[in-house]
Amino acid sequence: MTPEGTGLQFVSPFAFEAMQKVDVVRLASLSDPELRLLLPCLVRMALCAPADQSQSWAQDKKLILRLLSGVEAVNSIVALLSVDFHALEQDASKEQQLRHKLGGGSGESILVSQLQHGLTLEFEHSDSPRRLRLVLSELLAIMNKVSECNGEFFFKSSELFESAVYLEEAADVLCILQAELPSLLPIVDVAEALLRVRNGAWFLCLLVANVPDSFNEVCRGLIKNGERQDEESLGGRRRTDALRFLCRMNPSQALKVRGMVVEECHLPGLGVALTLDHTKTEACEDGVSDLVCFVSGLLLGTNAKVRTWFGTFIRNGQQRKRETSGSVLWQMRRQLLLELMGILPTVRSTRIVEEADVEMEPTVSVYSGLKEEHVVKASALLRLYCALMGIAGLKPTEEEAEQLLQLMTSRPPATPAGVRFVSLSFCMLLAFSTLVSTPEQEQLMVLWLSWMIKEEAYFESTSGVSASFGEMLLLVAMYFHSNQLSAIIDLVCSTLGMKIVIKPSSLSRMKTIFTQEIFTEQVVTAHAVRVPVTSNLSANITGFLPIHCIYQLLRSRSFTKHKVSIKDWIYRQLCETSTPLHPQLLPLIDVYINSILTPASKSNPEATNQPVTEQEILNLFQEVIGGDSVRLTQRFSITAQLLVLYYILSYEEALLANTKTLASMQRKPKSYSSSLMDQIPIKFLIRQAQGLQQELGGLHSALLRLLATNYPHLCIVDDWICEEEITGTDALLRRMLLTSNAKTHSPKQLQEAFSAVPVSHTQVMQIMEHLTLLSASELIPYAEVLTSNMNQLLNSGVPRRILQTVNKLWMVLNTVMPRRLWVMTVNALQPSIKFIRQQKYTQNDLMIDPLIVLRCDRRVHRCPPLMDVTLHMLNGYLLASKAYLSAHLKETAEQDRPSPNNTVGLVGQTDAPEVTREELKNALLAAQDSAAVQILLEICLPTEEEKAKGANSDISLRNTQGVTTISTPSKETEEGEDNLLCNLREVQCLICCLLHQMYIADPNIAKLVHFQGYPCELLPLTVAGIPSMHICLDFIPELIAQPELEKQIFAIQLLSHLCIQYALPKSLSVARLAVNVMGTLLTVLTQAKRYSFFMPTLPSLVSFCRAFPPLYEDIMSLLIQIGQVCASDVATQTRDIDPIITRLQQIKEKPSGWSQICKDPSYKNGSRDTGSMDPDVQLCHCIESTIIEIINMSVSGI
């Protein structure tokens, strides 16, 4: 601080506080010199009429008067207050206007005229009014110049404010003027003016002390008008000094003023100076000092503007050559160094001397044994110096660098704070390697790093912190070995909590020390395997963990390079996981799988890691395999099970993707057995993961992707929809209805109830109703009993409600254990043939041949609840078969590849076997799907027994008058047992629903099935019951063009039903094509084939006309043409045929006249020759009937 105020009496904090609070008792205790400074305010207080009329103030006022009575200077102040201030203000305003007109020139003053002597002598000889005018004139002149200079600082020499004899009288006048003329002399403007004169800080403190309420206003004004960098200019330094004096007078507001400094980003030196003043008065030995906190907050805070502003202050301060002890920056650095040295007691460390180089001097002293109470403060100091050097550009002196290195290499106690301190020290060494400049310092650093390696296990076990600095050492060593310097820089910045610029070249010496002296790659690898896994690893555990080190070592293939097994460590870590999922786990699994399948180098193709064994995987799932999924205390968490499931699925996928690469290896990695996969409850685990999506991060979506690729039968849309119903609001309501009785039924009781089904249905129904209230996982123990007893539910007399309940329970179980459930169900529904032992199918059998599902008991075909289950399994196994064959094709891709000896001269043909195998696979899948569809369509046909009962007319979709409809039974039929809700109709609907899904999924299936053909009796059912049948319009032209007459007939019959169901422009064009084809075939077919073709297809022409009346003329012409051809082929019966041909011509020409005749019953049953067995004659009669039907339809307007 400048020596300008030296020797002057300033207002003490005690006196200022007394003035603020108007504490008369404390004011009375002041000494005469202290009281003299406050007289202007006290005299005004005593003389002016108060706003406070209370009795207490009256007493205080008496005390003030008594206090003032003995002071001689009071009389002069009273005389000053007696002046006419209104006239004075008017003269001052006139002088301001005059100066403004004259352009600020120093013309004649209205306030002060005819000065005979110097300003000081005039002041001495003048009375009170003139003294007021002298000071006011001088003050206004300075204020005017301040406003004219636009912020540029200047220094004004003024006798009035410099003469030590009259300072107190001038201060009295100044205070009275400001108090009486506040509008003319705003206190902030007066403060700005006082900065420009000598002793301005003293005058300013007196002025504020006499107006204590203006303290914050004055400080804020001075800061706001201040310079961005105060130590760079005289004005900045004077402003800083003045504000420091003010804050010394009112120390309680010093930190608030410092906040104003930061807020405005002005006067950084003042902020530091106030902090230094506060640190000296509020010094705390053990805790982090206010200086460290303040500077750290500026440089490490989120406000970039503040960070840049303070960084500029540090850089500018260093550029000045004269950084003397008077500099605020120098004082700050000195204080920080003192604090740093204060926590480093000098201790002779015999251990280090013993380990050190023999050439070291025996008198070396090392700072060691950092006290526990100093650790947090040491960490804060390290981060501060990192910020000063890395962000603000501070260049440490030799003394600072030496002390910093001693602090960094000190040894803290084994506490969490000690672990943090060591991590910070290590990163600071990496970030600022220039701190190590001499061989002795380098040796000290190496010894400290060696101590870190030896002590990290002890620190971790004692401190209880999972993220020890040992992992960071390993990680940095691995980064150095793989030359990932940018990763080291990111690690350093992350640990220090600041973004600093580190040149990769500065790490070269540290890299040499790490890779050659401390951590060779083999040492790193061997050490990493011995590092304990992190217990209950989750995202809540931050910092650098063993998993980070293992991940980097796996990426660099260090384990395989040095033949170190890492499988057990990874397995243990996966078992020790919990939610929320740590983000490094999935990348760890991915890189581990890659290290299993991909050799470390071409020269050593067998250098790979070992996969997790099947037994280890089974141990992890043993709790849920046996149905104990609801066990209260689980040995392994659901997170561990999901991670291992992710590992298995990813491993299998990668194995298939790298088949060609792995073929060249002598020791190929093996796929996990199907028996292992059958025992893992995949769907149950996926469902558990669905409820933990937020905590599992991306694991749930990754599992779904793998599931859709490798297990499409577990991703059926219907299952997801069903699962939503099971886990929705209804499930919550059912849980509310769950009674204790529902929980008491055991699987054994359910088996006993099933055994009693032939006699009584009540008990099994009651137990199953209770089971519907259980959750899916709670139902798992009952699965075997439910499936094994399905066969006896096929017996007659079993209520429909029992069957529906079994279906409902099966669907619930299907959400958690579909694959096991399907195998048990297929085996349970096998036909019960005496003397023949039933075969027990496995999961593999059913994936190879999905049609096994349909080789069930025939009674299932007329039991809709169980047929629904069967169709569900069939759909799943068809999808599973596709995935199985695709995987099998990839696994055996190398078997058909020709050997190099056989491929000479066959360049370009090496891929032929692959293409052939793919085609064979597609052909097999198409045959499999079409066979399933044909079997299902066959099931839709009524049996002989059902036909005998006349069920066909009532229970199937029929064609009435050429219109495909669903028949509506009479009331009598509804009351009968065979109605629209009969079993056959329900089974037909279920099958049509599945066929619709299959056709939509793969339209080629529909094409293949219709090219194969099926009974025409089913066409009304399939066209009306399968919404996707319209896709047949795309390939009917191709089907009609087939040479087989049966396919052409089937195509026209199919088209006739499609035209009625879908009367679209496309249908019209295909129908027109069909009519043209029929006309063409008429000219080429023989008599026998003509009869075989036109007899079944002529009714289709009626449907064409009904759907598309524009085809009427073409169809009528075709019919006449067919009749004429038939007549010409029967020369011996021309006499009999001529009348028919004549009638056909008349019907075509006058259809309205014949419509009435056709309705005559005698015509329908009349004299036509229907006894002839000649095919042409029968065809002519059929043509006549077709024409008449078309005419009736057109006349009636249908």
Curated annotation (Swiss-Prot):
GO cellular component: cytoplasm; INTAC complex; integrator complex; nuclear membrane; nucleus
Pfam (any one): INTS2
Keywords associated with the record: Cytoplasm, Membrane, Nucleus, Transmembrane, Transmembrane helix
Keyword Acetylation: no
A Gene Ontology biological process term: snRNA processing
Ranges that cross the membrane: 421-437
Job of this protein: Component of the integrator complex, a multiprotein complex that terminates RNA polymerase II (Pol II) transcription in the promoter-proximal region of genes.
Quaternary structure (record): Component of the Integrator complex, composed of core subunits INTS1, INTS2, INTS3, INTS4, INTS5, INTS6, INTS7, INTS8, INTS9/RC74, INTS10, INTS11/CPSF3L, INTS12, INTS13, INTS14 and INTS15. The core complex associates with protein phosphatase 2A subunits PPP2CA and PPP2R1A, to form the Integrator-PP2A (INTAC) complex.
PANTHER family xref list: INTEGRATOR COMPLEX SUBUNIT 2 (PTHR28608:SF1)
Family membership: Belongs to the Integrator subunit 2 family.
Protein name, as recorded: Integrator complex subunit 2
Organism annotation: Mus musculus (Mouse)
Source organism phylogeny: Eukaryota, Metazoa, Chordata, Craniata, Vertebrata
Gene designation: Ints2
